């Protein structure tokens, strides 16, 4: 049943991301990815807020299915940046500043390299004759 809640949350998060990024692009002219920035920041806020509010030391107790729905499903579908942010915050809260910094540096660098590499490969495939 947990998979069902995660799938529903992911679908809702993905649809929300699509709508928000489109709406923000229409409002701002799409010159800068403000929609994505908004998605990443708000998703990070949501996972940090909900995770802390409903965690072991939280004020509210919710079932594991609810946490999976919101934190993995909804936030995961909305943005994967929220998971990265929560993991980095947890490292910092544990005093693991070097690991937190490493997580930040590696995530940003490798994600940028991966998107660049994906772009390069796609351009190469697009330029192949007969494609």
UniProtKB/Swiss-Prot annotation:
Topological category with respect to the lipid bilayer: Multi-pass membrane protein
Activity regulation as described: Na(+) is not transported, but it plays an essential structural role and its presence is essential for fluoride channel function.
Main location: membrane
Matches recorded under Pfam families: CRCB
Residues that bind Na(+): 76, 79
Reactions that this protein is recorded to catalyse: fluoride(in) = fluoride(out)
InterPro entries hit by this protein: FluC
Annotated GO biological process: cellular detoxification of fluoride
GO cellular component: plasma membrane
GO molecular function: fluoride channel activity; metal ion binding
Subcellular locations according to the entry: Cell inner membrane
Keywords from the UniProt entry: Cell inner membrane, Cell membrane, Ion channel, Ion transport, Membrane, Metal-binding, Sodium, Transmembrane, Transmembrane helix, Transport
Keyword Membrane appears in the UniProt entry: yes
TM segment ranges: 4-24, 30-50, 68-88, 104-124
Family per record: Belongs to the fluoride channel Fluc/FEX (TC 1.A.43) family.
Functional description taken from the UniProt entry: Fluoride-specific ion channel. Important for reducing fluoride concentration in the cell, thus reducing its toxicity.
Protein's recorded name: Fluoride-specific ion channel FluC
């Amino acid at each position: 049943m947990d998979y069902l809640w995660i799938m529903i949350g992911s679908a809702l998060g993905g649809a929300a991301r699509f709508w928000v990024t489109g709406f923000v692009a229409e409002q701002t002219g799409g010159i800068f990815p403000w929609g994505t920035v908004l998605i990443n920041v708000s998703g990070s806020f949501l996972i940090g807020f909900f995770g802390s509010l409903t965690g072991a030391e939280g004020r509210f107790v919710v079932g594991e299915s609810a946490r999976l729905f919101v934190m993995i499903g909804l936030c995961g579908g909305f943005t994967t940046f929220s998971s990265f942010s929560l993991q980095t915050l947890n490292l910092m809260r544990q005093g693991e500043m070097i690991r937190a910094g490493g997580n930040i540096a590696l995530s940003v660098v490798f994600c940028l390299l991966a998107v660049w590499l994906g772009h390069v490969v796609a351009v190469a495939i697009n330029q192949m004759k007969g494609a």
